[in-house]
Amino acid sequence: MILDSINYPKDLNGLNSDELEVLSSEIRSLLVDTVEKNGGHLGSNLGIVELTIALHRVFDSPNDTILWDTGHQTYVHKILTGRRKEFTNLRLPEGISGYPSREESPHDWIENSHASTVLSYAHGLASAYSLSGDKRRVIAVIGDGSLTGGMAFEGLNNLGHSGKKVTIVLNDNGRSYAPTISRLSESLIRIRSNPTYMRRQHRLEKLAEGMPWVGEILERGISATKAAIREMFEPPAFFEALGITYLGPFDGHNIEEIEQALSNAIEFEGPVVVHVLTQKGRGHAPAEQDSIKHMHDTSGMKSGSYTEAFSEALVKVGESNSKVVAITAAMPDSTGLLSFRERFPERCFDVGIAEQHAVTAAAGMAMGGLRPVVAVYSTFLTRAIDQINLDVGLHELPVIFCIDRAGVTGDDGASHHGLLDISLLSK
């Protein structure tokens, strides 16, 4: 197996395209075997195999700083950075963490399971390197789902304003925990699903294959034409307006194409977005066909669990009181709201990865006479303490918080523990 010879990122450099394709398949097999046994996040990691390989071939980690937003999609990164042999112990006692861990490896810069933070880390690191004269590169990998979070927009705004040299890799699979809630994501979907653009791109590629004698001149012309066609349908106006160069979209499962895009991004001064289209659950039929989560988290909601009991109770309460509404921050399944949403779709609100907005929106609903129920993980609730304290508590509003995954949660490491809820919420 080729994978047996990959102990560190430098081992990727001597592989040809055929070997890289085989390696991708071997990594997917290891992911499926391990995650189906130990639990964890399968779909997101199956979708990022080629992108991760390309990142580690183009950049020199850990000298170049590769940062991962949320962190649940770093299994391939772990495999390629010296933890291949330990990977079968993922999320087990004395095994490796399900999220990045600074204790595990110098390749893991930030320990995180909270979304939308990576661009702020990137801005800070790039600022530090600039002041010290350090030439190392900063790369921030963020999903389209994480771009629904307000902190991500704050990071984009500051990167564009400062002009710091950061490569932002937008991993666009069209999904996070649930269908992505965002007007920006809707724009990205229009790019990935526009049939005219896709047909013309395919025809241009076929034309190039049929006339190899034209060579590099035709290739450059076709690239420019493809870019023009793309921009007719969805100009990268959003990023450009912030002062950030936009490149893409690119096929996230074509290693050569990704490597070329990343290499091009390095040549620009200032921040650059490299928009990469990937398929969540790639190469594993059960994950590809899981329309709810694409096997985001294989542990799921167990029969007889507190989450299941809450789910059933909320539906009953909703049936008896039409003023009861439910709010989730991009996690309707994990927090037990799918049954309520199916029964009362107009009374279930998914606000995207935006816990602060969820809480204050609930406050507004309560002011308007509704009885909002905010379903949220304990670890994510702490992101909205100010809103709970002032927007709900100070106004003495009838908002109910149903807090899941409280206490020491174990498998996914320190950033997923729910240890602060009681102390922060007590009077």
Question: PLM features: residue spans?
Answer:
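N-terminal amphipathic, basic-rich helices that act as targeting or association modules
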Residues: 1-81, 238-262, 268-276
